[in-house]
């Protein structure tokens, strides 16, 4: 039987790690957008090598399950970083001394970079190229025309997908308990082990994820309305 009196206690236990989960997701999506934008701009050109290279990169992260990506990074990254850390610190750093957080961040940044590069590339292509040409014809430099005319419109087109993948990353972070990083799911698992409760902590975890999604969606909708109210719209 489910003891509903345990749910508030489990929710409070899980709530302690919510800021950490949100931060990990934010860092992942932020750098994913940053690097994805760079890749998207590069792929707008006609360089066959660049297009093939990044097409393979995107294809890999779209096809391979997140848990497999995480394990590949987790078991290989410490052996790559240990010599670097040793060189900078002047002391020997062994692979198992490298924090698993590095693996989590790298894995999810690469994951978001792959998806956001496609999202941003599509958004850039959705902007009428005639606006860019008209701006250049009026005396704007190519860079200024791109950053002042094309980029703001593409940003608004891509914005919903940014938020969608932020929520998706929050949920995917439930995988990180497998590499000894504590997130919301891991916290529920710890509660289950500590108090020998099998159902309540996971129901509380589901409520926490659901409530968080509702709150973040509301905040995003309000922010998007403000942006559109300031003239940031798809037809700008």
Q: Model features per residue range: what roles?
A:
Residues 1-236:
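Transmembrane alpha-helices and adjacent helix-loop boundaries
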């Amino acid at each position: 039987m489910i003891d509903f009196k345990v749910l508030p206690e489990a929710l409070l236990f899980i709530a302690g790690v919510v800021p950490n989960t949100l931060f990990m997701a934010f860092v992942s999506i932020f750098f994913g957008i940053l690097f994805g934008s760079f890749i998207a701009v590069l792929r707008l050109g006609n360089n066959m090598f660049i297009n093939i290279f990044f097409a393979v990169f995107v294809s890999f992260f779209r096809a391979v399950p997140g848990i497999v990506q995480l394990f590949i990074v987790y078991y290989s990254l410490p052996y790559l970083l240990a010599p670097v850390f040793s060189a900078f610190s002047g002391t020997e750093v062994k692979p198992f001394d490298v924090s698993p957080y590095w693996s989590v961040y790298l894995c999810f940044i690469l994951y978001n970079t792959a998806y956001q590069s496609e999202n941003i590339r599509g958004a850039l292509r959705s902007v009428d190229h005639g606006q860019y040409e008209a701006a250049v014809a009026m005396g704007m430099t190519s860079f200024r025309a791109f950053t002042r005319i094309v980029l703001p419109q593409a940003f608004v087109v891509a914005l919903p997908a940014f938020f969608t993948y932020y929520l998706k990353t929050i949920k995917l972070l439930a995988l990180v308990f497998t590499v000894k990083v504590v997130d919301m799911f891991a916290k529920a698992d710890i509660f289950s082990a500590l108090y020998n409760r099998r159902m309540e902590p996971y129901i509380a975890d589901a409520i926490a994820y659901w409530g968080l999604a509702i709150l973040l969606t509301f905040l995003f909708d309000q922010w998007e309305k403000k942006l559109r109210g300031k003239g940031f719209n798809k037809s700008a």
